[in-house]
Amino acid sequence: MKAHPKIALAGSVNSSYQTLKKLHEHNMDVVHVFALHPEKAKQVSGYKDLKIFAEELRIPATYFRDINNNDILQLIEKKHVDILFVVGLSQIVKASLLAAPNHGCIGFHPTMLPKGRGRAAIAWTILKNLTPAVTFFQLDRGADSGPILEQIPIDLDRNEYPLTLIEKIKSTINVALDELLPKLKEGKMNPKPQDHSKATYLGVRREEDGCIQWKASAEDVHRLIRANSHPYPGAYSFVNGEKITIYSATLRPEFTGVSGRVIAVEQGNPVITCAEGAIELGEIQSVQPVNWKIGMDLEL
């Protein structure tokens, strides 16, 4: 690969923004930015309008709805892009786009690849107590299966929330790119193939997957609430037929009672018993305020 490659970036979230910021700091030759159109913002948790930031940096930028659109392919060829960074984008990159840059595409994933390939990695990481990471890798036709260029593991706290993990990822992206970008600038890459025999996969998550099952253990309910918290839609339950969305909670192992029942109310916060232990609800959203009382039942 030649030194001082021409770079383009496609993305839609904080990790995309962070990558663009670092590319600029390292004086990489960023010739274009492809920003997911604001019309798609509601479909993306933590959406970031990259076009606005790119224009602040005086980098040409265009919106896209489909990253595989022919107009994008033509623009990559017209600008002689050597490397396309695809960061923070859930759309599948098709073979035609993979082949468009002279030296391919670089992707990002917040797990220790080959473990944790797939979707909703941050939520699954908290839900299943996985090891998060910053991994930059060469995109190929598989799902997060290309050779690894840079990888740094991240410590997961016992009470981690998505927003705190995202902050850790953002700071670790800086460290990883401080290692990777000087190599790319010199025209050097040292890709390491993944061990596909050790691969694990994460499935797509939908809003309804945040429905709380109070017959689960308090630990499991606590993880579900944390995994679905901001910037995601939140875990939820129903009381008196009304939906409540829950964004934070605290374990209260000293309480035992019937699953899904309010066993205490402390400073306005209900303590709900589960199959094992209980949790105290913190941040709650509902159409109407709930007048919590001991003995109230939530839907199981």
Stretches found by the model and what they are:
Residues S12-S16, R65-N69, L89-I92, S229, ...:
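Short beta->alpha connector loops
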Residues V31-H37, P60-K79, L84, I92-F108:
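Internal alpha/beta domain cores that form substrate/cofactor-binding pockets in large enzymes
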Residues E39-L57:
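N-terminal beta-loop-helix "entrance" segment that forms/cooperates
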Residues M1-V44:
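N-terminal Rossmann-like dinucleotide-binding module
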Residues H4-P5, E25-H26, I83-Y201:
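Donor/substrate-binding cores of folate-linked one-carbon enzymes
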